[in-house]
């Protein structure tokens, strides 16, 4: 889908045009029975790339509506030449998750939470979730994980016993990557030792110390994707859209594409 074929439809509002600028609504209208769309069926597009009218971004990996049918995966050869099946599968499940009412932190939109082992987490979208048995999991978090209080982290506990099947990669005091079982002690503050007292670390890199929760995605999933209808005498509520900021440049920096 080159950008010239997916211009924004004129009949939609300004807010929606900014996020549906790829023309998905028009493509769906031409190729998908409206009765199915209005009765809970989903609709997705495998695209090469799209141009966001608001930012001009061309190499986003996709876009999805939150709690409403409609998403697109755009990891095509123009910007994502060499993208493997892991990238395609992870991005597909990520964008579908938005339709199923999931956000980047599951129940919230705090991204990058290390113990949130879900492809909704940008950390795991392109690569899958590393498991202790050497495999990678492409899916949603299926159990509650311990809450991490960034201002008082217990290094001895790691991510707790629930994280025993997962791996965690972090930097050591010399800046080298260390991969270890996530339920073992973790040197969060990178001082070379496991501290006995709580430490304060911004684990998800958002610049603030926060309480990072990671509840099971199964508690948040909503399979009723029927589009919102207009209220009495009111306009149709516009769906919230999530343009994916993970780009081909990010994949290239990770060594995932040439």
Name each model-derived stretch.
Residues 1-117, 121-126, 170-185, 197-200, ...:
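Active-site-proximal segment of zinc-dependent metalloprotease catalytic domains
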């Amino acid at each position: 889908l080159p950008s010239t074929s997916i211009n924004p439809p004129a009949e939609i509002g300004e807010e929606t045009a900014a996020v549906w600028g790829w023309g998905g609504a028009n493509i769906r209208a031409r190729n998908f029975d409206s009765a199915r769309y209005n009765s809970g069926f989903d609709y997705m597009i495998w695209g090469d790339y799209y141009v966001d009218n608001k930012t001009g971004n061309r190499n986003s990996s996709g876009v999805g509506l939150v709690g409403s049918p409609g998403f697109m995966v755009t990891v095509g050869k123009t910007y994502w030449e060499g993208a493997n099946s892991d990238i395609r599968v992870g991005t597909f499940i990520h964008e579908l998750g938005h339709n199923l009412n999931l956000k980047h932190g599951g129940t919230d939109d705090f991204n990058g939470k290390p113990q949130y082992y879900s492809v909704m987490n940008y950390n795991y979208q392109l690569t899958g979730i590393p498991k202790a048995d050497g495999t990678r999991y492409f899916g949603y978090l299926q159990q509650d994980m311990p809450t991490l209080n960034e201002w008082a982290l217990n290094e001895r506990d790691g991510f707790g016993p629930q994280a025993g099947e997962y791996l965690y990669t972090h930097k050591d005091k010399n800046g080298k990557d260390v991969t270890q079982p996530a339920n073992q002690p973790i040197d969060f503050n990178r001082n070379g030792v496991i501290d006995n007292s709580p430490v304060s670390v911004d684990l998800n890199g958002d610049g603030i110390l926060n309480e990072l929760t990671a509840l099971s995605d199964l508690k948040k999933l909503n399979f009723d994707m029927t589009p919102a209808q207009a209220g009495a005498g009111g306009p149709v509520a516009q769906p919230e859209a999530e343009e994916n900021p993970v780009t081909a440049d990010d994949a290239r920096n990770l060594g995932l594409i040439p």
